């Protein structure tokens, strides 16, 4: 009973994260579109993020940096959505099933892609930022560690499914 209550709370927080990340991605995209007509908007793109220097330097670089951020937050929202789906499909009477394993692998891949996007974003921002002494807004790149851990758990669940099916066959 306690586990099911915790899972419901986790599902609520996953929905909360999903909605929040989608709002964040949408807000950045909308302010980017506004900054095309009014460069001053880039001074406070989202929550104090000032990319005005990048916009005045090169609209192309500015666009890439903003799109990295939109894609990154969208992928994070997608991962939160996968967690919601995982929690929906999770059956505590038979926790080792192919749905759980597939969702865990998808989450692991999503986090790995997130890590790649963060590295590309950070490299791009550092190349320009250091060269022209611009303020840099970097993403954490600790995603690969999390991706590996979730992938390992997915493999454990897969092994649990194999053992469970072997036991079902022997009964």
Q: Where is each model-derived feature located?
A:
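Alpha-helical transmembrane segments of integral membrane proteins, especially early/N-terminal helices
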Residues: 22-44, 70-74, 104-111, 166-171
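Perimembrane loop-to-helix junctions flanking transmembrane segments
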Residues: 37-59
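Alpha-helical transmembrane segments of multi-pass integral membrane proteins
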Residues: 113-171
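Alpha-helical transmembrane segments and their helix-start/interface "positive-inside/aromatic belt" motifs
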Residues: 4-25
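Hydrophobic alpha-helical transmembrane segments of integral membrane proteins
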Residues: 93-127
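Cytoplasmic juxtamembrane regions at transmembrane-helix boundaries
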Residues: 2-9, 80-106
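Membrane-helix boundary elements
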Residues: 51-76
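Alpha-helical transmembrane segments of polytopic integral membrane proteins
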Residues: 19, 23-26, 77-84, 113, ...
């Amino acid at each position: 009973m306690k586990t099911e209550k915790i899972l419901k709370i986790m599902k609520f927080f996953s929905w909360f994260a999903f909605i929040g990340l989608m709002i964040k991605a949408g807000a950045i995209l909308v302010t980017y579109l506004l900054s095309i007509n009014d460069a001053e908007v880039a001074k406070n793109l989202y929550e104090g993020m000032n990319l005005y220097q990048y916009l005045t330097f090169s609209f192309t670089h500015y666009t890439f940096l903003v799109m990295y951020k939109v894609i990154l937050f969208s992928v994070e929202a997608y991962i939160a959505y996968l967690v919601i789906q995982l929690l929906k499909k999770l059956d505590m009477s038979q926790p080792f099933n192919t749905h759980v394993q597939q969702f865990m692998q998808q989450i692991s891949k999503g986090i790995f892609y997130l890590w790649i996007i963060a590295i590309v974003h950070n490299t791009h921002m550092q190349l320009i930022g250091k060269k022209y002494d611009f303020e840099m807004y970097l993403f954490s790149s600790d995603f690969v560690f999390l991706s590996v851990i979730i992938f390992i758990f997915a493999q454990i669940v897969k092994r649990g499914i194999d053992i469970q099916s072997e036991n079902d066959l022997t009964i």
